[in-house]
């Protein structure tokens, strides 16, 4: 496993936390609507990827990144310090479910855990990062509800089955599904991921599909979405 990943404007050191840079994370970081946001919360920050992408995309925002795992928190803190935006990035080593913020957030971003109990395939921090028991969907959404502003947007990425379940739980907690993008690896395959936007305010609903690969490599839509981050994507 590579211990680092370099983007156009920042660098991710993975260290010993066992959380590699994933396509899921890059998709969410590029897709989430953080325009006109001044306060952004990154839940389960891991190496800090989503926070760094948000800082690059929105030069006016302050990003709070909350991470429970000590090793990951140290790695994210280092990545923030080495970035061009360290003054706007704050690492909070804390359990999200007991976190009390001094203000509401305009945007929340989260790549939630999705392994159900008994399905863990690995040990350690990477397994914890993907295990639903560490941050159950209902508790995650209930606490998001207390932290998000009345018109704020919360963005997530999940596999299709878990994403559909997540949306049902969200609606029970008074969230509106305001945007969804179904992600396919190729045109002929079924979607494998859902990019999900929720809000307590009923924004206009948007639905789309994103295909990552076409016959010649990466699709035009994928390149357009991620070209400001990936090297050699122009």
UniProtKB/Swiss-Prot annotation:
Chief location bin: cytoplasm
Gene3D superfamilies attached to this UniProt entry = Vaccinia Virus protein VP39
Swiss-Prot/TrEMBL catalytic activity: adenosine(37) in tRNA1(Val) + S-adenosyl-L-methionine = N(6)-methyladenosine(37) in tRNA1(Val) + S-adenosyl-L-homocysteine + H(+)
| Localisation | Cytoplasm
Give the top-rank taxon of the lineage listed in the UniProt record for this protein: Bacteria
Keywords assigned by UniProt? Cytoplasm, Methyltransferase, S-adenosyl-L-methionine, Transferase, tRNA processing
GO BP annotation list:
methylation; tRNA processing
User: Which InterPro entries does the annotation name?
Assistant: DNA_methylase_N6_adenine_CS, SAM-dependent_MTases_sf, Small_mtfrase_dom, tRNA_Adenine-N(6)_MTase, tRNA_adenine-N6_MeTrfase
User: Among the entry's GO cellular component annotations, what is one?
Assistant: cytoplasm
Q: Per UniProt, what is one GO molecular function of this protein?
A: tRNA (adenine-N6)-methyltransferase activity
Physiological role? Specifically methylates the adenine in position 37 of tRNA(1)(Val) (anticodon cmo5UAC).
- Name the family: Belongs to the methyltransferase superfamily. tRNA (adenine-N(6)-)-methyltransferase family.
Q: What is its EC number?
A: 2.1.1.223
The protein here is known as tRNA1(Val) (adenine(37)-N6)-methyltransferase
Q: Which organism is it from?
A: Aliivibrio fischeri (strain ATCC 700601 / ES114) (Vibrio fischeri)
